[in-house]
């Protein structure tokens, strides 16, 4: 008989009971997000979903994303209740720009040691995000991987699938000189630029938990969840049929994201003076001595979504968006690009 102690999975750092406890805690979260097309609940090997009724030639649209190093800030601040909203937003906002309605969402949560309370907070946020987007949380993977992550640190990834009518895909091909560009405000930096943000905080030696901007704690401004634009944009598409292109302003800011939906020969002329930049961006620029162009290449600077419509549809589009609770404004227009010109021109950049 061997005198060696009998080892278990728990001895190796994996607690199966904790994983099962988490599944029980999040079943109600998934249930709240359920769409009629989803067949079955959590716990199966795969999630089943029908194509919604009414589509003649449905095209599935997929996307995956994370929340970048905003997660590090969440871990440092021990604030886990809204990072799941960020995760959903990063995926569904990317889907809606081509006109797709998000159908279902899955998440991947990897950690060194599973803290059930933390994970439940994260997944509850994911559920809240799915409700805001109108999609179902149909499953996910929780991986406890000792030796891969430090303690209870965790990483997140999200995966989303949506559907759009083939004839109604929005791809930017109809964008023409003279079209107007509308903008929807962001809630803050959303989920991009946090490596720069964290570097600024470090170099400035800023105590972000004791700094207030416009009467709000800086931590609240930095951790504000990414806005989910799905329902207002689907309403705009359905009620006006006027949307030619949309750009989700993520990493790369206005300068890198608008060109992704422009046809060759088109240039977006954006008036930076058309909106009041939120104070959090001015604070970051001052503390980090960040060049103005760099600000617009890394951060959204207060703009979460840009929408292209023909000039004659501007007023109708603004009205639909306002009726949906948004605060849109005209941010610029499309021009013909001169030979060798950048696809985005920022007008009225302030001197730094």
From Swiss-Prot:
Keywords: ATP-binding, Cytoplasm, Ligase, Nucleotide-binding, Purine biosynthesis. Gene3D superfamilies: PurM-like C-terminal domain (3.90.650.10), PurM-like, N-terminal domain (3.30.1330.10). Its EC number is 6.3.3.1. It is found in: Cytoplasm. Its main location: cytoplasm. The keyword Cytoplasm applies. It is an enzyme of class 6 (ligase). Pathway: Purine metabolism; IMP biosynthesis via de novo pathway; 5-amino-1-(5-phospho-D-ribosyl)imidazole from N(2)-formyl-N(1)-(5-phospho-D-ribosyl)glycinamide: step 2/2. GO terms for cellular component: cytosol. One of its GO terms (biological process) is adenine biosynthetic process. It catalyses: 2-formamido-N(1)-(5-O-phospho-beta-D-ribosyl)acetamidine + ATP = 5-amino-1-(5-phospho-beta-D-ribosyl)imidazole + ADP + phosphate + H(+). GO terms for molecular function: ATP binding; phosphoribosylamine-glycine ligase activity; phosphoribosylformylglycinamidine cyclo-ligase activity. Belongs to the AIR synthase family. PANTHER family: TRIFUNCTIONAL PURINE BIOSYNTHETIC PROTEIN ADENOSINE-3 (PTHR10520:SF12), TRIFUNCTIONAL PURINE BIOSYNTHETIC PROTEIN ADENOSINE-3-RELATED (PTHR10520). This is Phosphoribosylformylglycinamidine cyclo-ligase. The lineage of its organism: Bacteria, Pseudomonadati, Pseudomonadota, Gammaproteobacteria, Pseudomonadales. The gene is purM.
């Amino acid at each position: 008989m061997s005198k060696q102690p009998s080892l278990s999975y728990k001895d190796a750092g994996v607690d199966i009971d904790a994983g099962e406890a988490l599944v029980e805690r999040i079943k109600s979260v998934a249930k709240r997000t359920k769409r009629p097309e989803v067949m079955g609940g959590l716990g199966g090997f795969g999630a089943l979903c029908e194509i919604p009724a009414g589509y003649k030639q449905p095209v599935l649209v997929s996307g995956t994303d994370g929340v970048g190093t905003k997660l590090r800030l969440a871990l440092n601040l021990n604030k886990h209740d809204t990072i799941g909203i960020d995760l959903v937003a990063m995926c569904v906002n990317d889907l809606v720009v081509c006109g797709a309605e998000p159908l279902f969402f899955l998440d991947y949560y990897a950690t060194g040691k599973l803290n059930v309370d933390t994970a439940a907070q994260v997944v509850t946020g994911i559920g809240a995000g799915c409700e805001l987007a109108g999609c179902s949380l149909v499953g996910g993977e929780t991986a406890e991987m000792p030796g891969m992550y430090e303690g209870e640190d965790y990483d997140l990834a999200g995966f989303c699938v949506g559907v759009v009518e083939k004839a109604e895909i929005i791809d930017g091909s109809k964008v023409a000189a003279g079209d107007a560009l509308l903008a929807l405000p962001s809630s803050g930096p959303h989920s991009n630029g946090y490596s720069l943000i964290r570097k600024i905080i470090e170099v400035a030696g800023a105590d972000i938990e004791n700094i207030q901007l416009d009467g709000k704690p800086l931590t609240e401004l930095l951790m504000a969840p990414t806005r989910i634009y799905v329902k207002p944009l689907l309403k705009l598409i359905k009620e006006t049929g006027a949307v030619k292109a949309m750009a989700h302003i993520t990493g790369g800011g206005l300068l890198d994201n608008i060109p992704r939906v422009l046809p060759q020969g088109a240039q977006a002329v954006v008036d930076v003076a058309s909106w009041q930049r939120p104070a959090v961006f001015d604070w970051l620029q001052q503390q980090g001595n960040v060049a103005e162009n760099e600000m617009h290449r890394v951060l959204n600077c207060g703009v979460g979504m840009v929408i292209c419509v023909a000039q004659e549809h501007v007023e109708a589009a603004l009205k639909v968006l306002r009726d949906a609770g948004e605060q849109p404004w005209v941010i610029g227009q499309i021009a013909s690009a001169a030979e060798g010109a950048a696809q985005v021109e920022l007008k009225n950049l302030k001197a730094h």
